[in-house]
A protein has these predicted regions:
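N-terminal loops that bind phosphate or other acidic moieties
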Residues: 1-265
Length: 265
């Protein structure tokens, strides 16, 4: 017997939550432990829970002590971990704590070798939390642009086109920095179509958007940009890695949970 509508709705809700739980979903997508180092990075509201799940699985094979790295989550969403550091930062408008943590993440993957593994854990909110302004602009300048984009009615794809080209870590730049190490991204999707290039602004995948796209969005919504941001969006060196870039050849993405899977639960 199903019971009252309230009980049915609660069961449906619990089923969807269980499907989305990193503790249950992540284990089936983990890559083998590497011969070299294992660096854990990531960002999102579920980043701490995902880090816990990785530690539990690595602990089962007796290699959890080899894990290192950090993930960024929203204030109030931190959980206790043993080897992977969890840093809290602001969402949806980035703050200095997020920038500092993102800089540490980028530094942690720089200089790795081909036997090393970067495991990137992404979930909803990752784009705002993984903020590292590209050279030439400040956090305050990026905040102004972010606020204007959030208030003008731009779509998530349009916002991300701007974010990527103003970032030192998004739009494939994280994976490019990690090369020649292998980069495996485990992502919980919260976007329509489950496009890895949109989830957290795609720090480990080729960016299909261009500088021209970013500037079109600015013009479309009549966004007034700080002079430094105008300069960044006008220089060719601000372009993000594209499909076929050799620096992305060892990067892959695995969607561990999608909205459709939660709905069907």
């Amino acid at each position: 017997m199903i019971g009252t509508p309230e009980i049915l709705l609660r069961k449906m809700f619990d089923s969807a939550v269980n499907v989305a739980s990193p503790k249950l979903s992540l284990r089936h997508h983990l890559p083998p432990s590497p011969m070299g180092r294992t660096i854990i990075v990531g960002a999102g509201k579920a980043a701490a829970a995902m880090a816990q799940a990785v530690e539990a699985e690595w602990d089962d094979i007796g290699r959890a002590g080899e894990l290192e790295g950090l993930v960024i989550t929203r204030y109030g969403h931190s959980l206790e971990t043993r080897w992977i550091e969890v840093v809290e930062a602001a969402h949806p408008v980035p703050d200095a704590a997020g920038v500092s943590a993102a800089a540490r993440i980028l530094e942690s993957v720089t200089g790795l070798g081909p036997d090393d593994l970067v495991l990137c854990l992404l979930s909803g909110g990752g784009s705002a939390l993984l903020t590292l302004p590209i050279e030439g602009i400040s956090l305050d300048e990026k905040r102004v642009v972010t606020r204007d984009l959030l208030n003008c009615g731009a779509t998530i794809s349009e916002i991300n086109a701007i974010r990527k080209h103003l970032s030192a870590i998004k739009g494939g730049r994280l994976a490019a920095a990690a090369f020649p190490a292998q980069t495996v991204t485990l992502a919980i999707s919260d976007v329509p179509g489950d496009d890895p290039a949109i989830i957290a602004s795609g720090p480990t995948v080729a960016d299909p958007s261009t500088l021209a796209d970013a500037n079109y969005v600015i013009e479309k919504y009549q966004i007034e940009l700080p002079p430094a941001v105008q300069m960044v969006l006008g220089r060719k060196s601000s372009e993000t890695p594209k499909a076929g870039d050799p620096l992305l050849q060892r990067a892959s993405v695995r969607l561990i949970v999608t909205p459709q899977e939660a709905l069907e639960a």
